[in-house]
Amino acid sequence: MSEHEDSLLFRQRHTLAHVLAEAVQRVQQRDVEVAIGPAIDNWLYYDFLFSPEKQIWEEDLKKVQDQMEKIVKEWQDLIRIDVPAEESDYLVNTLMKQKYKDEMRREFLAAWENISFYINTIVEAAKDRVLQWIDENYVKYYEWITEYLQTKYPEKFAGKFVTFLDMCEWPHVGSTKEIDPKSFKIDKLAWAYWRWNSNNVMMTRIYVWAFSNKEELKEYSDMMEEAKKRDHRKLGKDLDLFFFDDLTWKWLPMYMPRGYIVYHLLEEYIREKETKLWYLHVMTPCLWNVELYRTSGHLAHYQDGMFPIMEREWEEFVLRPMNCPHHMMIYANQLHSYKDLPIRIGEIAHDFRFESSGTLKWIERSRHFCQNDAHLFVTPENMKDEFKKVVDLIFDVYKDFGIENYRCILSLRDPEDKVKYHQDDEMREKAENALREVMNEIWIEYTEEIWEAAFYWPKLDVNVKPAIGNEYTLSTCQLDFCLPAKFDLKYTDKDGEKKTPIVIHRAILWAIGRFFAYIIEETKWVFPVWLTPEQVRIIPVADAFNDYANKVCEELRTNNFRVSVDEWWDSFNKKIRNAELLKIPYILIVGEKEVGSNSVSVREFVSKEQYVLSLDEFVKKLDEIVKSKK
């Protein structure tokens, strides 16, 4: 048991999962299948299967919340019993009548001799008062269970009345009096497949926030309210950036014109950065013969994350999940000398991964994405220098976007896992040691974590902690001694001998959509001017000044700025409001005074400053701001 799992807060949350299940049983007169209920991060949840007539919906959650608080205030004691296989069978199948618990019980018995149960109890003398509003059949059911347990375990259950019984191994608090009844709150109702398998039944999942006290709950609740304001899904819809539709498959994003402007600018930005570092950009197909992935090892180690194989004209094809094998083919298409290396092959590549729906999060993680990918073919002599340049590029990009809240992780394989990873211990150890040595030489603070490596190479992951949600990887850089050998890649060294290059895999923005989502949520869509889809909105104070407004617009467009004129019939104030809702950096107001002086009245969205500039002065000012990437 880890220190986290033995902490008071973990035990409180885990007990609240049982309290949640008990509350649902009370609300639905026990007509429910209970499945599993763990504590996770700031949450806990429990999965249920309801009969159609007893299904719980959002409007029922208030009743469940009230029952949870009532149960906690009952100061229920939790009693643990450990029973052998035969008795566990009786408890689960005869008393509880829970088939999903029985499925887990059978699995547990393969590893353990005894099965643990936690039983919620109240003082028996208080039963009639505490349960006076509870369904009579529910009470009779637990009278039957109480009688059995009092007979079987008199020393534990004398004077106790059972209110809930669950099979469980993890630790709990001794009594619900150790839980603040105002320290938790039901958050939402969701859906999840039993055992995370889409071939199984779909269950109802209820999520609950839980903390040590009501103050911590309020702090977290306030943070989540802020998160809703920043959520890229909401902002994407409100600002006409992108959307998802069931007709096109809800995990494939559709970018609107405003959203695609930003998407394209991000592509241009990173491509320009790479070109200055002598990257050679290529384009490779999205659909490949499946033999390519057999050669690379992806089919053996990553097929669950790939789209199904297609067969046409006696050949098998698959949508590519990643670009490594394709860039190996690009390299192999020509002969190379050591003088040619390093060769830096880059691509903004369309990739397709059939990841489970539970891991997907709109454009942050979708089944189709464009990866800012590159593969550097290097010699042992220039490997370290090239790796350092990649790290420098990562932090140069982060500086441009003001990204400061990140951590570096050296991700290594689990040596005990013989399934996930390519089995070449010598090559793997060589790559891990080389990567560790480089990290130490460039003085980057990092932590080492096992299990997170790719199946045939170790990697440096740069994880960001966004303003909302959990941290995730935004950039990655991987060292590979394996794939070049699989594709028999060679270069001629200075002695005329054939050698195998080392490959550095790297993705700076990872996927363009993920990076887009990150900066939306970090900035609340207050983007730097160079990245904003509409940089200037011109608003004439009356129709008489539309011609001048369009003249200003033409001048700005000639200088490659993104600008529009609002000539709609809305009121002047509504036009201002509309521009502010879209968070357009500059609103230019033009009227009689501006026409006479060839000037514009400027309103800045961020600073709220208002001032007047000549048109030439404003063009010069805006040009400097855009070029500075501010």
PLM feature segments, named:
Residues M1-E33, D41-W43, D47-K630:
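NTP/phosphate- and nucleic-acid-binding module
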